């Protein structure tokens, strides 16, 4: 971390070049990684196919644990893609941090609240759409008055709070991780050999911990996604 993101203007709107470039690279990494894992499917899986099948089983397990059986097939693929994308997005900044003229060119997209809140908004809109499709518009809106009418404002506030916490939780963890990693790197080069060696060990230790945190955050995000969708369907 450190420095502002690169931006450009188009039709009077400001676009974040850093997030766009980083996101496109992650899309490519995810696509080619999954394509390589699944290109030669065998009855007896080995190597990359084992990892691929484990990922599918893992995300299917999340969906099965939270959603009714009749709806699981509709959201299994979405949960799989969402988990893999967020996992790679969380780890991206640990490897690819690039600055140019004091501005960040590459970083983890999930270290930007705009990206994480956009993902959160996408999830909430999907949950609302699923609720309307399953219960009808009238039945869905009636769910806001349960268990009694006075709960209407509380239920509305709960949805807004879910939207904020889903996005800001992952942003806070990834941003803090990359910020501390930058601080450790600056400390390592502050006093020559006296700080380089301990700084190197600290950096490696923190990177390992950040991989763990990034994985947990991807899991939490997908789990809460299935929880929110399941609740809207059942209301």
UniProtKB/Swiss-Prot annotation:
Membrane spanning stretches: 17-37, 76-96, 113-133, 179-201, 211-230
Entry's family note: Belongs to the ATPase A chain family.
GO function term, MF aspect, one: proton-transporting ATP synthase activity, rotational mechanism
Subunit structure: F-type ATPases have 2 components, CF(1) - the catalytic core - and CF(0) - the membrane proton channel. CF(1) has five subunits: alpha(3), beta(3), gamma(1), delta(1), epsilon(1). CF(0) has three main subunits: a(1), b(2) and c(9-12). The alpha and beta chains form an alternating ring which encloses part of the gamma chain. CF(1) is attached to CF(0) by a central stalk formed by the gamma and epsilon chains, while a peripheral stalk is formed by the delta and b chains.
InterPro entries assigned: ATP_syn_F0_a_bact/chloroplast, ATP_synth_F0_asu, F0_ATP_A_sf
Protein name: ATP synthase subunit a
Predominant localisation class: membrane
PANTHER family with a match to the protein in the record: ATP SYNTHASE SUBUNIT A, CHLOROPLASTIC
Gene source species: Limosilactobacillus reuteri (strain DSM 20016)
Keywords noted in UniProt: ATP synthesis, Cell membrane, CF(0), Hydrogen ion transport, Ion transport, Membrane, Transmembrane, Transmembrane helix, Transport
A GO biological-process term: proton motive force-driven plasma membrane ATP synthesis
Job of this protein: Key component of the proton channel; it plays a direct role in the translocation of protons across the membrane.
GO cellular component, one term: plasma membrane
Membrane topology summary: Multi-pass membrane protein
UniProt keyword Amino-acid biosynthesis present: no
Subcellular location: Cell membrane
HAMAP family, A to Z: ATP_synth_a_bact
